């Protein structure tokens, strides 16, 4: 994974095929979460013990360790042209705090918040889903030079918003509520895995790696926007 750099008319970043597919999958899952209204978590956002990744061979550029982490997350990457709304998976009550973070109340007063929810949540949900799917489309079929992921000038806020929503979901799953918790997640992401690592620990390490990976990539975009 390479950070963003300025390019003609925008910004570009070169990613391995599996990295693009994986990030697109995270975006798709958040979009699915926004659209869900029943029970049963999206792949990869569940607590662990999923069916696992059924692929027998790693994708191009994907290491055996990367594949093991994705298998622990029960991750199934989307294909080009597939939208989040094409295969909805409903969200269980356990993910209610995540949805509340993505679609916050318009008021601290419970009665006012309930009254405003119908007016504010639907437009916000639509906005977030639209930008998530736009970013996902570029990741699956990049338009930059030599297959690089491209952000056209003027679309930066759309990308930052979409990436931030995914980070927010991952942070909630990791219980990150401050700098210390973020540092702990970073340490989990890069610590050497014990030989007897159980499924729960592997799942948490996978989510931590995802959070770390996405944070670094987003920060590379912010840095190039601020300093060139």
Feature roles, as predicted:
Residues 1-151, 156-228:
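Charged, alpha-helix-forming regions
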């Amino acid at each position: 994974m390479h950070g963003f750099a300025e390019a003609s008319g925008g910004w570009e970043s070169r990613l391995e095929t599996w990295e693009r597919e994986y990030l697109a999958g995270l975006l798709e899952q958040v979009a699915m979460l926004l659209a869900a209204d029943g029970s049963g978590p999206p792949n990869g956002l569940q607590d662990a013990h999923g069916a696992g990744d059924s692929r027998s061979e790693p994708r191009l550029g994907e290491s055996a360790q990367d594949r093991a982490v994705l298998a622990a997350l029960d991750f199934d990457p989307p294909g080009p042209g597939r939208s989040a709304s094409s295969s909805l998976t409903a969200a269980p009550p356990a993910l209610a705090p995540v949805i509340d973070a993505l679609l916050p109340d318009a008021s601290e007063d419970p009665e006012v918040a309930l009254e405003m929810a119908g007016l504010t949540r639907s437009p916000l949900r639509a906005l977030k889903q639209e930008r998530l799917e736009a970013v996902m489309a570029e990741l699956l079929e990049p338009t930059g030079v030599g297959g690089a992921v491209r952000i056209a000038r003027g679309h930066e806020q759309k990308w930052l918003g979409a990436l931030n929503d995914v980070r927010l979901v991952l942070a909630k799953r990791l219980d990150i509520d401050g700098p210390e918790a973020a540092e702990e997640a970073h340490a989990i992401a890069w610590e050497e895995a014990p030989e007897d690592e159980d499924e729960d620990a592997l799942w948490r390490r996978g989510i931590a790696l995802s959070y770390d990976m996405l944070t670094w990539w987003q920060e590379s975009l912010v840095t190039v926007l601020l300093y060139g």
